[in-house]
UniProtKB/Swiss-Prot annotation:
Residues 242-533 are annotated as: Catalytic. Its cofactor is Zn(2+). HAMAP family: Thr_tRNA_synth. Residues 1-61 form the TGS domain. PROSITE patterns: AA_TRNA_LIGASE_II, TGS. Its main location: cytoplasm. This is Threonine--tRNA ligase. Homodimer. Binds 1 zinc ion per subunit. One of its GO terms (molecular function) is ATP binding. It comes from the Bacteria. It is found in: Cytoplasm. The keyword Cell membrane does not apply.
Length: 638
């Protein structure tokens, strides 16, 4: 007689084993109809599996986060059901849930097209309208092997081989189609309604390019029609803002096959990069960082000593010279310790903050590369703070202020903060872990910040705080981080002399605000839709001549504006002024200055903003004053 305890503390007694669906039915028909699965003693369970002992039960519906994930996972199985009905010689690989959706990797000699996506989507719609029950079969490993051998599902058999002999395997039966999964899944397809298949892409079995080539079908699913429509609108907007398209359209950068994952910056894009670097450099200087520069290639012996050779060898580019092997640095920290190690350091010298715009290379898989967001060569706004244990909290607190100042400058006001604490496998004493975690916690709490704890997610060498931005499309980008490191200063012999004249290892704080320049610029391109604020824009103002008579004045003003430190260009083509204004607007230039006969007579320009607003007539001194005010605000309106 299982006693079921519900979230409100109430208890229900049942005479025999009971399913989550039956528990829901005992509460009300409406809840039973909405039930997707349950959480039993903190373990997710299918709605139709019997519970035969006293348990704490939470009923899951589509309103719950777990509910929508279960819906999405069930839709992945529906892809399998549909494609197996439509196409022959199809083998199913894996179909997991991802953020906002799901995908299924499929092996087929037939190459799917966008027209096939429509066909598959129509078949899925047909299947879900039949409202069939999804049966769960809990079988032994031997029975699972037999099932998938009969169906010639090669990839499922490979997965089963990795499963231990003991225990049962969950098979899910969608009419004639059978798939395997940990589950849970919806009990009936009436819970599956609001979905869209999105796109096709290529993939490899287990993500290894040496394995079979697969085809991936992506989809999204939501609990309500409005949520689906809102998401598809966001997807459409994201495609409009795609930094790769805008980068090409506005001649910011390009990537080519001869140098995958490495950026060819064009003058417009490089201007943005340089302005961003200058801004960060000023911020660092104001906060007492010392800028350094370290080599690109370093003998592998240093990477062996630091531990990177053992852990990251496959991700490192190497070269050889005179019988020595060098690694192109994938990160800057070991090199920064070499700078710290030059000369004796006293506790009175700490903290020492070493910063570098460090160019790094990592051998990312070609399939993972994505414009500016995932590259092989990137520049970090990297810094390492060498300090005592007692200084950790103050340094972290100051860094948090710095992060918020920079993000606010770019218009990011919603920052998500996560604190990751000690993992099971770690170095360092419990005492120093206690002190470090307490220091990070206090630094956050003293500022009354909301943050999320991630127990056990810290690195083996110390806890960390991660800072993520939420952009205009509600996408989250993890950028900033500050990481406590007890290990590397010891491995690389970094020491200082303490107050008792004893040598001690400093604590090292790894920290970055942007993460990498490439990725952050990619985020900015999409955030601004390439309509950069005036301080960051490749060109801040464009001068347009109305007639050929005004060309000389345009050129003279352009020279004066550039000589005063602004970024200006001209359009003196023999085109109608309306056409020129439209072109300048499409080119995303923040200020558009028109010079005709009337303006030339009074040595001024007719100024308009990118949004079309007429700003009035300005002579050069007043124009410079306006531009200085706009640049000083850095696009902020407060």
């Amino acid at each position: 007689m299982p006693i079921i305890t519900l979230p409100d503390g109430s208890k229900k007694v049942f005479e025999k084993s009971v399913t989550i669906l039956e528990i829901a039915q005992s509460i009300g028909a409406g809840l039973a109809k909405a039930t997707i699965a349950g959480r039993v003693n903190d373990v997710l369970l299918d709605a139709t599996i019997p519970i035969n002992k006293d348990s704490k039960v939470v009923i899951i519906t589509s309103k719950d986060k777990e509910g929508i994930e279960i819906i999405r996972h069930s839709f992945a199985h529906l892809i399998g059901h549909a494609v197996k009905q439509i196409y022959s010689d199809i083998k199913m690989a894996i179909g997991p849930v991802i953020e906002d959706g799901f995908y299924y990797d499929i092996f087929s000699e037939y190459r799917f097209t966008p027209e096939d996506l429509i066909k598959i989507e129509n078949r899925i719609n047909k299947l879900i309208k039949t409202n069939y029950d999804v049966e769960i079969l809990q079988v032994s490993k031997e029975e699972a092997i037999k099932t998938f051998k009969e169906r010639d599902e090669t990839f499922k058999l490979r997965i089963i081989e990795e499963i231990p002999e003991e225990g049962l395997i969950n098979l899910y039966k969608h009419e004639e189609y059978i798939d395997m999964c940990r589950g849970p899944h919806v009990p009936n397809t009436r819970h599956l309604r609001h979905f869209k298949l999105l796109k096709l892409s290529g993939s490899y079995w287990r993500g290894n390019s040496e394995n079979e080539s697969l085809q991936r079908i992506y989809g999204t699913a939501w609990a309500k029609e409005k949520e689906l429509k809102d998401y598809l609108t966001r997807i459409e907007e994201a495609e409009k803002r795609d930094h790769r398209k805008l980068g090409k359209k506005h001649s910011l950068f390009h990537i080519q096959e001869e140098s995958p994952g490495m950026i060819f910056w064009h003058p417009n894009g490089w201007t943005i990069y340089q302005v961003l670097e200058k801004y960060i450099r000023e911020i660092l200087k104001k906060n007492d960082y010392l800028e350094i520069k370290t080599p690109q290639a370093v003998d592998k012996s240093l990477w062996e000593k630091s531990g990177h050779w053992e852990k990251f060898r496959d991700d490192m580019f190497t070269t050889a010279s005179e019988n020595r092997t060098y690694a192109i640095k994938p990160m800057n920290c070991p090199c920064h310790i070499q700078v710290f190690n030059q000369g004796l350091k006293s506790y009175k010298d700490l903290p020492i903050r070493l910063a570098e715009f460090g160019s790094c290379h990592r051998n990312e898989p070609s399939g993972a590369l994505h414009g500016l967001m995932r590259v092989r060569n990137f520049t970090q706004d990297d810094a390492h703070i060498f300090c005592t244990e007692e200084q950790i909290q103050e340094e972290v607190s100051t860094f948090i202020d710095l992060v918020f100042e920079v993000y606010k400058t770019f218009g990011f006001d919603e920052i998500i903060i996560k604190l990751s604490t000690r993992p099971e496998k770690r170095v360092g004493s419990e005492d120093i872990w206690d002190k470090s975690e307490e220091a990070l916690t206090k630094a956050l709490d003293n500022k009354n910040l909301k943050w999320e704890l991630q127990p056990g997610e810290g690195a083996f060498y110390g806890p960390k705080i991660e800072f993520s931005l939420k952009d205009c499309l509600s996408r989250v980008w993890q950028c900033g981080t500050i990481q406590v490191d007890f290990s590397m200063p010891i491995r690389l012999d970094a020491t200082y002399v303490d107050i008792d004249n004893e040598k001690r290892n400093p604590v090292m704080l790894h920290r970055a605000i942007l993460g990498s320049f490439e990725r952050f610029i990619g985020i900015l391109i999409e955030q601004y839709e390439a309509k950069f604020p005036i301080w960051l824009a490749p060109y801040q103002i464009i001068l347009l001549s109305i007639t050929d008579r005004n060309i000389e004045k345009c050129l003279k003003f352009n020279e004066l504006i550039n000589n005063n430190g602004y970024r200006s260009k001209v359009d003196i083509r023999n085109e109608k002024i309306g056409y020129k204004i439209r072109e300048a607007t499409l080119g995303r230039v923040p200020l558009i200055a028109v010079i005709g006969d009337k303006e030339e007579e009074i040595d001024s320009v007719a100024l308009r903003a990118l949004n079309g607003k007429n700003l009035g007539i300005f002579n050069l001194p007043n124009l410079f004053k306006l531009m200085d005010e706009l640049i000083e605000k850095k696009g902020r309106t407060e």
